[in-house]
Design a protein with these regions (language model features):
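Glycoside hydrolase catalytic-domain context in secreted enzymes
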Residues: 1-365, 374-390, 407-813
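Extracellular/periplasmic metallocenter environments
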Residues: 371
Length: 813
């Protein structure tokens, strides 16, 4: 059989474009001046991540790239001589033993939960094992690479081997730091690890998970060919310092008692100790910020400051602007990020004037009593710095009276608790800081028309009830049952694609959708015959799931995902896609231009393979470091999240016929029983924290699609919430695209839970356009809803019209 395995031009270009900017996603947490190294040398390399390098998380976030450069490979390719390889042989033996026991227990747990083992196993990760192996390798320098992986379907635990370091890791890291003059602790992780036992280590690099060139990027950093310039988008602290979340593991209800005090808003306001604060990050070089100048033109605020490289190596710095608001009727965090900007690469001695801007209405607080966004009278302190812990007062903006910036309405339900509130604290004006008067009349109150007229296309109006309903359900096989009914028909036209919209209504185009927030996720190889395109091997399940299955089950999944092995003589075609950095790493760059270039990479590959909608980016908030899917998400801060999602969307949608699907809308901040868990969140916290990033992304980039989340919000499934979908998303944010559900809702909820799954008829009634990936049961449910009056045929045709218009726009009819 002929196999076209030579790397395609797009692969080479994309990998080259990525690698030169990857150091910008990494965060130098500690340094003593002993790095970078002058040249490749003999390097003692320890830790699971040297050989088992993690490029990204598990689940829908996995990307089928042609290869990954491990840290071992990247260092060897850069000319290093690695020692300590016998350590890895011993580690693999310890890991294999632990993994067998892990799988055995997993099968027992799936049976107890009455869940399909494949779906139950999604995201389940074995903790790092303990071991006792000698550290007898010599070298001019040494590294220890801590790796952690997490994923869709399961949350992290505060146990050793996950959020906490194992005893073995702590012992070896401290021993190596003592033994070697030049030692670097490298963190190949997607989320926070409690580093409190090893804070004495002199050099720590958060490498993160950078996609295909993860190993090469580390080699560049160790040799000084690239300089880390990332900043933390999540507060790193000892586990005990985070807000208590006693019901995080509750099957049915999750109460967001901390309200708006998420991440640094909590740590700063309540004076909690962070190991490394939000916005923090060092460089091989040093920078000095000049005195900031602040101007206000009505509600528009502009901040200018000069950044000078005072060190000996070229590098980049991130300027961060924070706003401290007066506490009046509403309590307020100590400070909130309101703008940021990254310098270009500055040579030693070079300086750049950086300009950041924001508007005061963007920083308004939500008053649930009056259902309005307000700016209260008082002083607003503008702070400028390089992290939330390193800011300098730059100006006081004084507002003479309270103003309303947007009159909304409460639509998200209520909770059975009162949000955490901050103690009242008077803000004193810093001496020597200019005071700028803000004219209240310059801030205009925005009003919203919630009674919007929706269009029904003539061709949709002419459809039968049955055909109109089909357009709201993903393409499904009416004869398939069980798991195959949802995923057995995925990717009819593009092998390995997640699924498609309905392709059986005459004269209506369909949309092809693909997963993979860290790149496009398609089948690696396929072939064509008279019956169509067929994936070679398994195209349905990520590698992280396949490794859990027995031999016979792997064969079954392979046959479902493709057609097994192709006949002799068939040409094997490839669909290798580029694995970009995980969402958190992208955000750590604080570089929206780079993120947009990553979107351009994805968009070009979508065009190349014929994919219309990318089921990404994901911009949920890092509410808790325990969320297993945080690696996909950008930050604990909504401004960072929204700006990054907008940049990614602009990059993708610059390509003809390509769109993003921003997700998961909203309050999807844990994975355990995610399809039937009720997030209980106040209207204020939802609007100021969990919805704000979506609003930024919609207003700045108009993504083609929005995906609702699995969970309920205050007792109503998000996909069934007309307040979320129509009132806030469409009316307040001005959204113009289509709304789909998250995928494979049936069969994924714990049978012991108190809440049901979302249903197609109620999703349609709320204004949801697509129930994905769809099966006959969902279709029948929608028809039943039309007949019972749960949803009107008019609403169904309104939703269907949006789907048809989007399909035409992206298929270029």
């Amino acid at each position: 059989m002929k196999n076209t395995t030579a790397m395609a031009d797009y692969e080479l270009r994309h990998i080259e474009a990525l690698r030169k900017d990857l150091a910008g996603c990494t965060v130098l947490l500690k340094k003593d001046g002993s790095f970078p190294l002058e040249k490749p040398c003999t390097l003692a390399a320890y830790g699971s991540g040297v050989r088992r390098t993690i490029r990204g998380g598990t689940g829908s976030g996995e990307v089928n790239s042609r290869y990954i450069v491990t840290i071992e490979e990247g260092l060897q390719q850069a000319g290093f001589t690695l020692t300590g390889m016998e350590w890895h042989t011993g580690y693999e033996q310890a890991r294999e033993k632990a993994h067998k026991a892990f799988l055995k227990q997993l099968k027992k747990d799936a049976k107890a939960a009455k869940q399909n083992f494949i779906l139950y196993g999604m995201g389940k990760v074995m903790p790092e094992p303990e071991y006792d192996l000698p550290l007898n390798a010599e070298g001019d320098a040494a590294i220890y690479v801590v790796s952690r992986i997490s994923g869709e379907g399961n949350d992290r635990t505060p146990l050793k081997g996950d959020i906490r370091l194992t005893d073995s890791e702590v012992r070896d890291i401290l021993a190596l730091d003592k033994k070697f003059t030049r030692f670097m602790l490298v963190l190949n992780v997607g989320g926070v690890v409690d580093l409190s036992p090893v804070m004495g280590v002199r050099n720590i690099l958060l490498l993160s998970q950078l996609g295909v060139e993860t190993g090469g990027a580390l080699a560049d950093i160790l040799l000084g060919k690239a300089n880390p310039s990332g900043k933390l988008t999540t507060t790193w602290a000892a586990f005990e310092e985070y807000p208590e979340m006693p019901d995080f593991e509750d099957m049915n209800e999750t109460r967001y008692r901390e309200g708006i005090y998420v991440g640094y808003r909590y740590f700063d306001t309540f004076r909690k100790k962070a190991l490394f604060p939000f916005g923090y990050g060092l460089s091989y070089t040093e920078f000095r910020l000049g005195t900031a100048e602040v101007e206000a033109n009505g509600a528009q605020v502009t901040v200018r400051t000069t950044v000078e490289n005072t060190g000996t190596m070229a590098g980049r710095q991130v300027v961060q602007v924070y706003l401290s608001k007066p506490a009046g009727k509403l309590d307020a965090p100590r400070q909130e990020l309101c703008a940021f900007a990254k310098t270009r690469t500055l040579a030693p001695g070079e300086a750049e004037t950086v300009i950041c801007s924001f508007t005061l209405p963007e920083m308004a607080a939500y008053d649930a009593e009056t259902a309005a966004y307000i700016l209260e009278t008082g002083d607003y302190l503008v702070r400028v710095g390089v992290s939330c812990a390193e800011t300098v007062p730059a100006a006081v903006l004084h507002l003479g009276k309270t103003v309303t910036t947007l009159q909304a309405k409460n639509v998200l339900g209520s909770t059975d608790f009162t949000d955490l509130t901050a103690p009242a604290a008077a803000m004193e004006r810093p001496e020597g800081v200019p005071v700028i008067e803000i004219d209240p009349a310059s801030i205009v109150c925005e009003t919203i028309d919630y009674a919007r007229t929706e269009e029904i296309l003539p061709e949709v109006n002419a459809l039968t009830k049955e055909d109109a309903a089909l357009l709201l359900i993903g393409d499904f096989d009416p004869n398939a049952k069980g798991l195959a009914s949802m995923i057995g028909t995925a990717g009819r036209h593009v092998c390995g694609a997640a699924g498609e919209s309905c392709s059986t209504v005459k004269g209506i185009s369909w949309l092809i959708m693909a997963d993979g927030p860290a790149g496009l996720r398609l089948a690696k190889e396929y072939y064509e015959d008279g019956k169509g395109k067929h994936a070679v091997g398994n195209a349905l399940m990520p590698d992280s799931i396949m490794e859990m299955l027995s031999g016979p089950m792997k064969l079954v999944m392979s046959l479902m995902g493709g057609n097994g092995k192709p006949k002799a003589g068939c040409e094997i075609k490839t669909q290798y896609c580029t694995a970009i950095p995980i969402g958190t790493a992208l955000a750590q760059s604080f570089d929206t231009d780079f993120v947009q270039r990553c979107g351009d990479i994805v968009g070009e590959e979508m065009e190349h393979f014929g994919v219309h909608l990318w089921l990404a980016p994901a911009l949920n908030i890092h509410r808790s470091i325990r969320c297993g899917r945080n690696f996909e998400y950008y930050s604990e801060d909504p401004l960072v999240s929204g700006k990054m999602a907008a940049a990614m969307t602009r990059g993708v949608q610059a390509h003809k016929g390509c769109g993003t699907t921003i997700k998961h809308y909203a309050a999807n901040n844990k994975e355990y029983n995610r399809t039937r868990n009720n997030s209980m969140v106040s209207e204020r916290a939802m609007r100021e924290i969990y919805l704000k990033g979506f609003g930024i992304c919609v207003r700045e980039s108009q993504p083609k699609a929005v995906m609702t989340s699995y969970n309920l919000l205050n007792g109503t499934h998000t996909a069934e919430s007309r307040g979320l979908v129509m009132d806030i998303l469409r009316a307040e944010f001005g959204y113009q695209g289509i709304v789909m559900t998250d995928w494979v809702t049936p069969m994924t909820g714990d049978a012991r839970s108190a809440h049901r799954d979302s249903q197609a008829q109620y999703v349609a009634a709320a204004g949801g356009d697509l129930f994905m990936p769809g099966n006959k049961g969902d279709y029948d449910n929608l028809l039943q809803g039309i007949d019972s009056g749960a949803v009107t045929l008019e609403q169904v045709k309104i939703n269907a019209s949006r789907v048809v218009k989007m399909a035409r726009a992206l298929t270029q009819e």
